[in-house]
Amino acid sequence: MRAPSASRLSVIGAILIAAALPAASALAQAPEGFFKGRQMTFLIGAGAGGGYDVYFRTFGRYLVRHIPGAPTIVPKNMPAASGLAAANTLYTSADRDGTTIGAFPNNIPMDTLFGNPGARYDARKLNWLGSIGKLENVCATWITSPIKTIAQAREREVIVAAAAATSNSAIMPKVLNALLGTKFKIVGGYDPGSGMTLALESGETEGVCGLSWSTMKAARPHWIKDNKLNVIVQLGLTKLPELPDVPSALDLVSDPVKKEVLELILIRQEIGRPVAAPPGVPAGRLEVLRRAFDDTMKDPEFLAEAAKLQLEIEPLDAHAIDTLLANAFASPKAIVAQAAGLIEPSAQK
């Protein structure tokens, strides 16, 4: 029998190579293998060093440990307009291959509904990975203030410190004034960290409304230990077990329409500290990211570091966020309009 000719061997080799290419290509594009050796970008819609930033940077370090291929991740702070810059960037111009994700303050998922004119995204079309935890906001006065209860805040003007006009510290006292009849006088423009702290401690202001309870415990634990604060009301869909004697704002609203407005606004608090990928990420890679998020939320090392930093972790998965948003966007137009008027006065409905 004659040996195959060189030309015939070349043809056979070409056929074998061609047959192998689809399998090799499929392997290279497998979602689990895509992230190997890649650098991810993590857009953080908050300033460096603040409460949101500490949460998100801690989370980001552990997230990549649960993504096959162990990619690296580079945080990029984009605090402008209370996180709108980060959300707009993620939605309009970020890579849609799964290598860019974003994390935001709690206003971002609802700003589309409330008609924020600066929002160039549809929150329902972002690919949510989950939320690190809800916001457990409270209103509190300093120990020297004569206002010790929410009832007293309905009788007498209370000067409260606030950051930007779009911050919780500015929005929540305005909401309570409208729906509960409180008399908070909002003094805005303070730095959300040290500025508001100094204003309270110096007596320049009497209190703050929309304060994150978990962030405050992490940043100012001595305030609790030394009983420096009078916590007068809770701002959430559910109450904090550790503050059993502090009433919930929802429990104080008797008018059913006002209650529905407040419930809609407080969905922002429930969503809390959300993380998302842009629209258009391939389904397999999105599943990898969502699985990595869920695994991070159960990672003992992550939870231990969070506890050390006094960061409370109460995660929501992607489905929970999608459900909250679907319910919010299904609200009656009249309720949305009233809520929007308190959250975003320039909204055009």
Q: Which positions does each model-derived feature cover?
A:
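Bacterial N-terminal signal peptides that target proteins for export
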Residues: M1-G13
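An extracytoplasmic/periplasmic, membrane-proximal ligand-sensing/linker region
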Residues: K36-R38, K225-K228, L252-S254, E260, ...
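Sec/Tat signal peptide C-region and signal peptidase I cleavage site
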Residues: A24-A28
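Structural beta->alpha junctions
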Residues: G47-A48, P278-A283
